[in-house]
Amino acid sequence: MAVKRISITEFVSMMEQYPILDVRSPLEYAHAHMKNAYSLPLFSDEERKVVGTAYKQQGKQPAIKLGLNYFGVKMVSMVTEVEAIIAANSDPNNKVVLVHCWRGGMRSAGVAWLLDLYGYTVYTLAGGYKAYRNWVLAQFTIEYQFKVIGGYTGSGKTETLHALQASNEPIIDLEGIAHHKGSTFGNLGQPVQPSQEQFENLLAQSLYKITASHHYIWIEDESRRIGHVNIPAQLFEQMRKSKLYFLDIP
């Protein structure tokens, strides 16, 4: 079965259903990636650097040969790793995977060819992670109907937000996404904060998922900066203009 190259719109619509294989280098993935994507690097960070240098200094074909030399010895281990990823998912009989690299070029094409040869149904992202980032930024220009929970420090804003979530109300937990507990506790007891780019990725995907089934979103009143990440400017302006539900606790 031939590899299918799809748009970012199609790719995003399939992200909740099938495993996402990010074939960029480990450092690229560590900086920021799609939510729930698995890291399956075609090249190590050093190999990527060497191939890039060869491309600039010697040209395309010598760089491709070098890349193939790196790729060849990894083929079996990469297939084995994908088998483990598939087995870890809810449907072990699923043979569909989504693959992307930085710009939808040779890295994703190479891994997609291998997995297609092995019998998987493979979809690659046209434009790669770069197209995804454009999609992420576009989510912050959409008009949302926010219901903003405000109140003084200690009034229970976060607890109220989580109570709404427990009642199946649609919420966005900005502090949770940022791994930060607000002005009082900061990142005490939290995982390391994500990069700004990763924060945006997680936030965009949360907005997309909620608005697929709800026309409003509960959100906590925040300053624009949460730890060392910032709420995107256009989204923050929307929050400022949205209806505020102030918790006036005696």
Region annotations inferred by a language model:
Residues 1, 26, 30-76, 80:
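Glycine/alanine-rich phosphate-binding loops at beta-alpha junctions
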Residues 20-24, 40, 172-173, 218:
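Short hydrophobic beta-strand that contains or immediately precedes a catalytic carboxylate
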